[in-house]
Amino acid sequence: MVLFHAQASGRNRVKADAIVLPFWHFKDAKNAASFEAEFEPSYLPALENFQGKTGEIELLYSSPKAKEKRIVLLGLGKNEELTSDVVFQTYATLTRVLRKAKCSTVNIILPTISELRLSAEEFLVGLSSGILSLNYDYPRYNKVDRNLETPLSKVTVIGIVPKMADAIFRKEAAIFEGVYLTRDLVNRNADEITPKKLAEVALNLGKEFPSIDTKVLGKDAIAKEKMGLLLAVSKGSCVDPHFIVVRYQGRPKSKDHTVLIGKGVTFDSGGLDLKPGKSMLTMKEDMAGGATVLGILSALAVLELPINVTGIIPATENAIDGASYKMGDVYVGMSGLSVEICSTDAEGRLILADAITYALKYCKPTRIIDFATLTGAMVVSLGEEVAGFFSNNDVLAEDLLEASAETSEPLWRLPLVKKYDKTLHSDIADMKNLGSNRAGAITAALFLQRFLEESSVAWAHLDIAGTAYHEKEEDRYPKYASGFGVRSILYYLENSLSK
């Protein structure tokens, strides 16, 4: 984890591998201009072609007497067009350049804070989170990687009051510990991150933090609770399912209680409805919802927010053998509702249904938010940059959108179209697990909503199928697991304290 430090002036700054000077579009930032006497011979020729456009970067060598070996000219664009997301993406791009240049220690000069259209807090959150997002290294198994980049180890931010800035940096670092945990769990081998291993990670959180209590139900306990849908999905696997319940109590006397549910399919072959080989290559990431829940809870415990949150992860493989659950058969969930299986590859909604029922029975939730890499239809609809979500409560939906805007984790609300619910009709069961071949993300959400029908609990379903994992580098994320959802939900939970 990179260490951040703030100081008001650059006079006594420490030596570093690089110094970053900010520039507006076709205009010097005043704080950068104040360093011209020190660096002008080095960067003046480069300014002839440097325009200061958003994300524009010029990497130069410094003068021999300077404290930094390299000078980086950083374009911030136009001040009047600056947003927190622009700041996030700009400093994320900067981080990628610095890592490739093997600059481990960096001094970053801020533009004049009082002249920004953003607040100091918004700018610093965007800066630190952009750096932290791209300063992650995913687990590697190769002995030698000659292209390995050098991660940033220390960033000194110059031009801000340290007391305020350092508090922001500590908060973002704690949040990204949770993001990194989520990414690590998703990126590792499916043979390593089994349902049992996810349970061990959850149990270790309980050992590390007094505010966390973890309970794990094994196969027999799952059967005792009559979670027939989770058991059905697990039938084809040689590893047992685990049902993980992690309770964080930051405000024990309060009745307000958020339940987070994460899909925990640690590998998804599709079952008897077997996926094509190419589609199966990334299916170790089908537990990203569960990993997101663990990342949120670990960060909550570090931040010590005065709030009550329970995380629930139904964890299993969706594997294939002679015992696999079969298309056309009917299984009964914990709710007592029966489901006709039309596709064994629509397994995520089945295990989430049992988790929702468990939450309603045992947790007395004020609200339920679930996370799942649920449908390919969502990827087709919104791509890999935006997660779609559904909600039965307008206040919850608006609060999630507010947190989304603060954290550069784009969410888009989709409708729960009642008319489409009829596509789930079954002649032999209470419902089918698959609707028509259209509006697949909506019908999946409608399936989940059926298990909340008699409840007044506010609910949101985040389909992170497109955003959880990227096979190439993105503006906001490194390659592979993104940890999408950890930051926005933590901001949502923190914001709820003032409402």
Curated annotation (Swiss-Prot):
GO biological process: proteolysis
GO molecular function: manganese ion binding; metalloaminopeptidase activity
A cellular-component GO term for this protein: cytoplasm
Broadest EC class assigned to this enzyme: hydrolase
Active site: 275, 349
Subcellular location: Cytoplasm
UniProt-annotated binding residues for Mn(2+) 1: 268, 345, 347
Family: Belongs to the peptidase M17 family.
Function: Presumably involved in the processing and regular turnover of intracellular proteins. Catalyzes the removal of unsubstituted N-terminal amino acids from various peptides.
Name by which UniProt lists this protein: Probable cytosol aminopeptidase
Phylogenetic lineage: Bacteria, Pseudomonadati, Chlamydiota, Chlamydiia, Chlamydiales
